[in-house]
C-alpha cells in the first residue's frame, strides 16, 4: 500500500474491528424469532466474575409480558426482568457452558454463543445433549 490514504483506511478498519471484538458479549441484544423473523425482546448481557448472564429488559410491541410456557414459580411471571441466559464463560473467543430458558416452551437448554458480523451479531445456540440437536438464533447488538 503505497497510498497513505489506503494505509490510513486499512488501519482505521483494523482498529474498529478490534474495538467491536473487545466489547465481547456484554451489552444489549435484540432477539429475533427464528420462526417469524420478527424482533421479540431486548436482552441485557452482563458479566460477573467471568460468568455471563442475560436478562430481558424490553419487549417489542405486541409481545405479551407473561411467560406463556412457564410452570411452577415462573407460571405467568413477567418476562421483563426474567433472567433467560445463565452461566456462559468465555473460552477461546467463544462463550460456552451456559443455559438458556425458552419462555415459549418453558424448557431450559444448554447454550453457547459466538460473536459474528464484527461484533454486531451474536449467534446463540440452544441444544439438548449435543450441539447438533439444537437451533441457533442470531441476535443483533443494540447501540
Regions found by a protein language model. Give the residues of each.
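N-terminal signal peptide c-region/cleavage motif recognized by signal peptidases
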Residues: 16-20
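Central antiparallel beta-sheet cores of small beta-barrel/beta-sandwich binding domains
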Residues: 26, 31-111
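Edge beta-strand at a domain terminus
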Residues: 121, 127-143
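Exposed beta-sheet edge/beta-hairpin loop segments within beta-rich domains
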Residues: 113-115, 130
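Bacterial N-terminal signal peptides that target proteins for export
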Residues: 1-11
Amino acid at each position: 500500500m503505497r497510498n497513505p490514504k489506503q494505509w490510513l483506511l486499512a488501519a482505521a478498519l483494523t482498529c474498529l474491528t478490534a474495538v467491536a471484538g473487545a466489547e465481547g458479549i456484554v451489552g444489549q441484544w435484540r432477539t429475533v424469532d427464528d420462526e417469524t423473523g420478527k424482533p421479540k425482546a431486548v436482552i441485557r448481557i452482563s458479566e460477573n466474575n467471568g460468568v455471563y448472564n442475560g436478562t430481558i429488559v424490553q419487549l417489542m410491541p405486541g409481545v405479551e409480558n407473561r411467560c406463556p410456557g412457564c410452570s411452577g414459580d415462573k407460571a405467568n411471571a413477567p418476562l421483563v426482568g426474567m433472567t433467560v441466559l445463565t452461566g456462559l464463560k468465555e473460552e477461546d473467543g467463544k462463550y460456552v457452558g451456559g443455559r438458556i430458558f425458552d419462555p415459549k416452551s418453558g424448557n431450559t437448554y444448554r447454550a453457547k454463543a459466538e460473536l459474528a458480523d464484527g461484533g454486531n451479531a451474536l449467534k446463540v445456540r440452544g441444544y439438548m445433549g449435543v450441539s447438533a440437536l439444537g437451533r441457533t438464533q442470531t441476535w443483533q447488538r443494540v447501540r
